[in-house]
């Protein structure tokens, strides 16, 4: 490795430790549109009895379906249609809708809401079932996301991710905020606020905890944050840098990158703290670990071959088997992320002076760039594997973008008015 290349990789490792731009706090709006030319036409009638509610379930469902890029919303008019109504499916088919949704929101004596709906196939002239959900003023949005998930799965055969959550870091003035939001960027909550950088959020498989790196003690330390209770605790505070936490599929272990002995190497720690174990034994820089979904492998970035590339090793470490190089397209590849089905590898490749998001088929080895942006970083798969969230630059600002994982459409920038946002992580399916 040339001195310039080695310095470049060391700069990358350093940038993984301090990466947050100035920003004004704002709502993230997630949009994924323009996916191919086979969008499914669907009409969602206004749900009965929701006109005066704090959240309009119908609007949430329509917005979810539209931003997925997989559906076209057919105008359903303004007349509410409850799930109990007799529906002329032929008439809706004639209007261009291949599916129709009817529903209602009813307030119960205890102050909660009962949200009911039915999904119809207008082509086959039959019901595709529905759900009856209980919600409160604060969970009506979640009910809407769950309805959209049901529709997505019934019509496309793939589980929807509308009811999942995102995490990301926003900086306001001299304050950093780790925020948790719905998958559409709405309903954002501040999990942690600090005057020191917060980086590398990583969701637990259950979706109830987030591991991250905080500099609040003037050095990078790995914390775990329990979202329901707000409790947080340190899991790695070793000598030097503690970075890049990644959960094992069983939630019992975190892989981390530590500079405990000089060069950054990969270790594991118990998710409750303690149990430190070294996995790599190289004189190079080994960093950015990520578990395969079956828990058998850890993918990571290393410059052991002369330049940064993606490798994988047994989850027990190199003592159980030599690390194998995985990426061969391009001379500088970092930030491995494996799709939930274990078939795809997303990573960042230095290309033509920029950095692009690539996706590689792990069976064939074929790899392709799937973005038209040039400062990509921090990829994160959606729980169904159909989309990737990542950080990039647009108009001189740090932004988030989303793109179909098959590259079938250009990436869409996620709108954050007046500010910058970094460090995205897409949460798992909620239990």
From Swiss-Prot:
Q: Which Gene Ontology biological process is one annotated for this entry?
A: cell division
Q: Which domain of life is it from?
A: Bacteria
Q: Which Pfam families match?
A: PD40 (PF07676), TolB_N (PF04052)
Segment forming the signal sequence:
1-26
Q: Please provide the record's keywords in A-Z order.
A: Cell cycle, Cell division, Periplasm, Signal
Region (Disordered), start-end ranges: 411-431
Q: Which InterPro entries match?
A: 6-blade_b-propeller_TolB-like, PD40, Tol-Pal_TolB, TolB_N
What the entry lists under SUPFAM superfamilies is as follows:
TolB, N-terminal domain, Tricorn protease N-terminal domain
Q: List cellular component terms (GO).
A: periplasmic space
The listed locations are: Periplasm
Question: What is said about its interaction partners and assembly?
Answer: The Tol-Pal system is composed of five core proteins: the inner membrane proteins TolA, TolQ and TolR, the periplasmic protein TolB and the outer membrane protein Pal. They form a network linking the inner and outer membranes and the peptidoglycan layer.
Q: Summarize the protein's role.
A: Part of the Tol-Pal system, which plays a role in outer membrane invagination during cell division and is important for maintaining outer membrane integrity.
Similarity comment text for this entry: Belongs to the TolB family.
The protein's name: Tol-Pal system protein TolB
Q: Which organism is it from?
A: Burkholderia lata (strain ATCC 17760 / DSM 23089 / LMG 22485 / NCIMB 9086 / R18194 / 383)
The gene is tolB
């Amino acid at each position: 490795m040339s001195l310039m290349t080695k310095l470049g990789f060391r700069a990358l490792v350093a940038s993984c430790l301090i990466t947050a731009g100035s920003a004004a706090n704002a709502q993230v709006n997630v949009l994924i549109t323009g996916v191919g030319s086979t969008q499914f036409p669907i009409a969602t009638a206004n749900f009965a009895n929701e006109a005066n509610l704090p959240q309009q379930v119908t609007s949430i469902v329509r917005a979810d379906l539209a931003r997925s890029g997989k559906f076209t919303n057919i105008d359903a008019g303004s007349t509410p249609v409850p799930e109990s109504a007799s529906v002329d499916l032929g008439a809706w088919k004639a209007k261009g809708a291949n599916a129709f949704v009817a529903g209602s929101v009813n307030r119960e004596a205890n102050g909660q809401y009962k949200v009911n709906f039915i999904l119809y196939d207008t082509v086959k002239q039959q019901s595709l079932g529905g759900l009856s959900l209980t919600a409160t003023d604060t969970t009506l949005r979640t009910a809407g996301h769950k309805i959209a998930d049901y529709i997505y799965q019934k019509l496309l055969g793939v589980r929807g991710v509308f009811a999942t959550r995102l995490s990301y870091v926003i900086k306001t003035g001299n304050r950093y905020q780790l925020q948790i939001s719905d998958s559409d960027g709405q309903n954002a909550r501040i999990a942690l606020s600090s005057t020191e950088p917060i980086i590398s959020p990583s969701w637990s498989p259950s979706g109830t905890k987030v591991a991250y790196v905080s500099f609040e003690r003037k050095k990078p330390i790995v914390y775990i944050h329990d979202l329901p209770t707000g409790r947080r605790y340190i899991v790695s505070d070793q000598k030097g840098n503690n970075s890049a936490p990644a959960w094992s599929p069983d939630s019992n272990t975190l892989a981390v990158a530590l500079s405990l002995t000089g060069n950054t190497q990969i270790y594991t720690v118990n998710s409750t703290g303690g149990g430190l174990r070294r996995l790599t034994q190289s004189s190079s820089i080994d960093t950015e670990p990520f578990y395969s979904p079956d828990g058998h492998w850890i993918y990571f970035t290393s410059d052991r071959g002369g330049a940064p590339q993606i490798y994988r090793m047994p989850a027990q470490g190199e003592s159980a088997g030599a690390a194998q190089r995985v990426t061969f397209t391009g001379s500088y590849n970092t930030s491995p992320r494996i799709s939930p089905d274990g078939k795809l590898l997303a990573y960042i490749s230095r290309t033509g002076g920029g950095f692009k998001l690539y996706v590689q088929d792990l069976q064939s080895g074929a790899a392709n760039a799937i973005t038209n942006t040039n400062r990509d970083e921090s990829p994160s798969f959606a729980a169904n594997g159909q989309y990737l969230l990542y950080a990039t630059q647009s108009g001189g600002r740090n932004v988030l973008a989303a793109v179909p994982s098959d590259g079938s459409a250009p990436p869409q920038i996620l709108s954050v008015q007046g500010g910058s946002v970094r460090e995205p992580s897409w949460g798992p399916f909620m239990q």
